[in-house]
């Protein structure tokens, strides 16, 4: 007896506006599987010319990684019937930037670390299997683990130019 294989799409869109300072206001829409829309904002701290009026983009990124993995841990603990009780997760994301004179800096990731603490009666092996399943189901972690091509276009008049 073969199990049914289901495929599903998860699709987001975001419209972002930056009126001239470091703050960016965004309307983020989940189109699939369950339509939902919210407004978010980012800003930079004073050292980068911002006002600190909202979380920095990397704060949202770090929180997004933590929340995505946490969601999968909780969802899969229920699906796999693994008793883990309360779950605590801590991330440490480290990048390094290099700048020559006044030129724009270039950045690269140095290390991303995630510490997970679970309560409950699950064995160590069950916890490891749960974490492995959650890693595979975490959209953010899977995106980070693969080479990705990100398309960029610039609007020029009424046309779009590939960058």
Where are these regions (language model features)?
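Alpha-helical metal-binding/catalytic segments enriched in His/Glu/Asp
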Residues: 68-69
């Amino acid at each position: 007896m073969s199990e049914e294989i289901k495929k599903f799409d998860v699709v987001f869109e975001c419209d972002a506006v930056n009126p001239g300072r470091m703050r960016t206001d965004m309307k983020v829409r989940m189109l699939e599987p369950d339509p939902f829309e919210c407004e978010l904002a980012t800003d930079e701290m004073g050292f980068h010319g911002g006002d600190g009026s909202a979380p920095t983009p990397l704060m949202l990124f770090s929180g997004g990684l933590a929340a995505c993995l946490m969601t999968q841990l909780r969802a899969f603990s229920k699906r796999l019937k693994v008793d883990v009780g309360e779950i605590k997760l801590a991330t440490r994301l480290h990048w390094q930037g290099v700048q020559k004179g006044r030129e724009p800096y270039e950045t690269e990731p140095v290390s991303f670390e995630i510490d997970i603490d679970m309560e409950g009666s699950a064995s160590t092996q069950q916890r490891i299997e749960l974490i492995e399943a959650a890693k595979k189901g975490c959209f953010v972690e899977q995106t980070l683990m693969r080479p990705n091509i990100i398309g960029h276009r610039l609007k020029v008049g009424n046309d779009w130019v590939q960058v």
